[in-house]
Amino acid sequence: MREKFSIRLISLDEIPEVTSWAMLEGFSPGMDDISIYRNTDKQGVWVACLDNNPIGSIACIKYNSSYGFIGLFIVKKEFRNNGYGVRLWEHALDYLKNVDCIGLEAAPDRLNDYSKWGFRKSSITNRWKLNGSKDLPLRNFYKDQFHSFKVVPGNKISSEAVLI
């Protein structure tokens, strides 16, 4: 029997799994990136499923009518080359069809694929991270000011706070 393909909104309990896929692909998802995407656009983070089991993901965030963003586009390796990624990609583009400009976080080895869809390389983004010490230089430098900062989980940030 043929498996049923579907695309649906990501659930909260699927976020850790999709984050682990991103890390396996060599992406550097920030802490709570997916929750922040989900909080910014409640309709913009999807999983592709076979018989309701997630096999792929895409974040497609509509910030406003002028700008949207696509990232987290992943199909698990064992399900690639079956057209599932194309269907997920087309779903995302359809969602952003009335947006003036779409930004894209692209895997370097897929740049040619994205150019075939009309995307042009604009810039390279590097994400830096520090592994290790609890005694970070920034914390020492701003030790007296740290009490004025409040750190909150990404899914607790209101959509009004992140709208352009």
Task: Go through the PLM ranges and name each one.
Residues I36-K42:
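Short loop/turn motifs at secondary-structure junctions and domain boundaries
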Residues V47, N53-I61, G68-I74:
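Conserved beta-strand in the GNAT
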Residues K62-I70, R80, S122:
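A conserved beta-turn-beta hairpin within the catalytic core of GNAT-like acetyltransferases
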Residues V99-E105, R120-K134:
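Conserved catalytic-core motifs of GNAT/GCN5-like acyltransferases
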Residues I70, Y95-P108:
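Conserved GNAT acetyl-CoA-binding A-motif
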Residues Y114-F119:
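Conserved active-site tyrosine of GNAT-family acetyltransferases
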Residues V75, N81-D94:
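Conserved acetyl-CoA-binding loop-helix of GNAT-fold acetyltransferases
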Residues M1-D33, T125, K134-I164:
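Short amphipathic alpha-helix that is part of the acyltransferase structural core
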